[in-house]
């Protein structure tokens, strides 16, 4: 199981003071050296953390691959076609949210999202869709003919007790259903060092995308060590 390291919150720290440090370029390079299988970043419409120039500077630097998260809107499509990352993950976006809340609604916005997805695919960019672990959403992703989905694990991360167990079961069932349909399945959102274990044990997940928890852990043990520790946990539980 691969680890995609999200470096958005390195940029959050930088933007808090409007400085040119900490460097997202250094963060990406060191994360790769520590075992990251890909580098994930989200260029939001409000530019609250990542900036356009970050994409252009990072793309030639990366030794693994860039997984660029974007809202499915024309402005972001234009940027993605110009930067041409290996992967684009289409995500929902609301300006007032702290972070991405929930998955895309592929039922309500099917045609708009499919149009953006098709444009990216035709340009040679691999597309994934960030969706809730729900069968009806997966069916729409299959209908769109995308190769990858990323399952939203936020409810699993937020819930406790029986609700958490129910959400875990939904994720397990969604992975199994999507895999049978030939989709590559990633997962992420809200995962950290204490809750990633049960997700890592799910057979069929290709990659976990994790950022905030790694940045937070790095404050105490260092950036590379934080990546190494997360990678170690995922590897241990994925094989158990």
Range-by-range predicted roles:
Residues 89-97, 148-160, 204-223:
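Glycine-rich phosphate-binding active-site loops on the catalytic face of alpha/beta enzymes
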Residues 3-7, 39-41, 66-70, 88-90, ...:
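Hydrophobic faces of well-ordered beta-strands that scaffold small-molecule active sites
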Residues 35-37, 61-63, 82-88, 122, ...:
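Glycine-enriched alpha-helix->loop->beta-strand junction motifs that scaffold or abut catalytic
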Residues 1-3, 60-68, 116-129, 177-187:
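Short beta-strand/loop segments at the ligand-binding rim of alpha/beta enzyme cores
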Residues 74-83, 134-144, 187, 191-205:
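Catalytic cores of alpha/beta
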Residues 59, 102, 163-164, 217-239:
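C-terminal helical cap(s) of enzyme catalytic domains, especially alpha/beta-barrels
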Residues 1-69, 73-85, 166:
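Conserved N-terminal beta1-alpha1 strand-loop-helix module at the mouth
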Residues 126-177:
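Histidine/lysine/aspartate-rich catalytic loop segments that bind and position anionic ligands
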